[in-house]
Every structure is written in structure tokens, then in C-alpha cells.
Swiss-Prot record:
Pfam families the UniProt entry points to: PAP2
GO BP, one annotated term: phospholipid metabolic process
Name of the coding gene: LPP3
Subcellular location: Plastid, Chloroplast membrane
Keywords: Chloroplast, Hydrolase, Membrane, Plastid, Transit peptide, Transmembrane, Transmembrane helix
Keyword Ribosomal protein found: no
Gene Ontology cellular component terms for the protein in this record: chloroplast membrane; plasma membrane
Its membrane topology: Multi-pass membrane protein
Domain of life: Eukaryota
TM region(s), chain numbering: 76-96, 118-138, 143-163, 211-231, 242-262, 275-295
Sequence similarity: Belongs to the PA-phosphatase related phosphoesterase family.
Biological source species: Arabidopsis thaliana
SUPFAM superfamilies for the chain: Acid phosphatase/Vanadium-dependent haloperoxidase
Chief location of this protein within or outside the cell: plastid
Protein name: Putative lipid phosphate phosphatase 3, chloroplastic
Amino acid sequence: MARFSFPCFPNFGGFNQAVTNRGPEISETADNWVSPSDIPLIEPNSKEHRMREAQLGGHTLRSHGMTVARTHMHDWIILVLLVILECVLLIIHPFYRFVGKDMMTDLSYPLKSNTVPIWSVPVYAMLLPLVIFIFIYFRRRDVYDLHHAVLGLLYSVLVTAVLTDAIKNAVGRPRPDFFWRCFPDGKALYDSLGDVICHGDKSVIREGHKSFPSGHTSWSFSGLGFLSLYLSGKIQAFDGKGHVAKLCIVILPLLFAALVGISRVDDYWHHWQDVFAGGLLGLAISTICYLQFFPPPYHTEGWGPYAYFQVLEAARVQGAANGAVQQPPPQVNNGEEEDGGFMGLHLVDNPTMRREEDVETGRG
């Protein structure tokens, strides 16, 4: 059966082939290398499976999916609570601040439709990264990576959404098109204190008091910012080899998020300060959430989640206690390779297996 490949990642299939070719030898040394009882989140039932536990490709949805999810049950419960809190914030009435006649100069821009529809924001901020995570899972077969990427992304977007809407309701800043929301017929009316007396549609007026910060922008940077960090770790964008093509891949999601923010100013739905604050908020939350599950992208182990390396360390400690000869844990080889992929683009595989294969084939 033909093996699926992706042009930009020609080396990524090498690890799976190496495991297949070395299956008998791996099985013979399995008992001496790892004892599964001390590996967290693992319940292996065969000798061959025990060896694959500590190797990339051994943690699949079928074998470990439910176990990993149960281990992080409290995280998923908090995630559901965040969804409920976000729904409550969408119902809460925002603060209606004083809007005087002299302020209308900056609030009389045309009332336009959204260049980027509201329904499209979850699509590119959440569904697009999820599709990429799933694609990489089918290439690597690492449920830790998939689970933590999905959980981190959802936390990034939902925490950002809750903070954004909470600030929106508390600040109540009028949008640049507030005049036409408040006075759709163009006839302004003010009370004795000089505050506006709006006679437009109540829902439109209510939405007009939610300018700061920009929700489109914060959502965009929280989702696509997380994706950018994830991709930079997977392709080792900061490995010191000088492949500019890697940076292009990392910057592309951020560029799209920035363009979304610019569209909010062009549509007169937000002031530039709203967009700047929204982008800063989304990018900060996405970075914090990413670093909860993954090493920094510039780290030599930035290609995998913390949980994967914790499994390897547990296996190493157990092997040392049993007096077994240990293999070094996988690390990213920072040296240039002949088969470094198209313009240096490839997903990082397991360098330990690659080194052993090189020795056998005479390339080492």
C-alpha cells in the first residue's frame, strides 16, 4: 500500500519506517529498557507495546486517548465553565457611559457591515488550527501532542473571549459609528445634562457600547497566535540554521490576524486603540496557554509537549533502576542534514532512531 507523504515534510515518514524495520530488535530489548508500571497515563498489555510507549508514534488515540482525557478531566470541566461564563457575559448589559455632543465628532463614521463576518471568526481561529493538529497527529501518532494542542488552543480562545467580553461590558466605550446607531435618522437628541437620548434599535445601540477591546482581533490572535507558536515548534523555526522559509510559515497566521484587526478599523467598528489592545490581549493569552503544555519554540525540545518528555524520563529512571543500558532521550539535531527537506522545512522526528539508522546504513 502506498505511503502518504507531504512534499514539504519528506523526512517525517522516516521514523515510522525505522520503527517498522527494527521491530524484532526493539521487541527483544523491550523488557530491559522500560517498565510500564511507572510510566504515567499508560496501561500497556504486551512486550512490543511497552517498548513503543516511550517512542514517538506509540501513544495513539485508541491506546491512550481516554486515559489522557480522564487525567485532564478537571481541565475540561473548567473549559465548560468558561463556555458558560462567556454565554453569561454575552447576555449582560454593557455600561452606558456618558456621550456628549462634543464627542460625536469622533463617533459619526458611517455604519458599515463587517468585512470579516462574525461567524467566520471561530472557523479560522479554532477549526483551522484543529485541522492542522489532526493532520500532524496522523503523521506522528502522538496523542499527547494532539490532546495538549487542542486543550491549549481552546483555553487560549475561551480565556481571551471571557476577558474580552468582560472588559467590553465594564468599559462601555462607544464605537466610531455610534452616532448612526443612536440616531439612525440623523436627528440628534440630548438630555439636560448633555447626554444622548438614543431612539435607534436597542440591540444596535447596545452593540455600539462594546468597542474596547476588539473581539475579532483578540480572537484572531489567540487562535492564530497559538497556531503560530505550535508550528514554530514543530518545524524548529529557531534552530539556528537560517531557513527563512520557516519564518514565513510562522508569520503567516499572525499576518492574517493583523489584517483582521485592520479591517475592524476600516469598517469603523473599532478605534485603533481597541484593535491594538485586542491583539495584545490575544497574543499574550495564547503565549501563556502554549507554554503550559509545550516548551518554548526555540528550545531543542520545542517540537514535542512536556508530557511526552515526562514519559521518556520516567522510562529512563525506571530503566536505570533496573540496571538496563539506556538510550539517550530524543533531542533535536541542530546540525545540517543532507535530507533537510524543501528549504529546510520538515516536521522534527525522533533523532534517536535516526542516528541508529544512520549507523546501520553507513551514513553515521
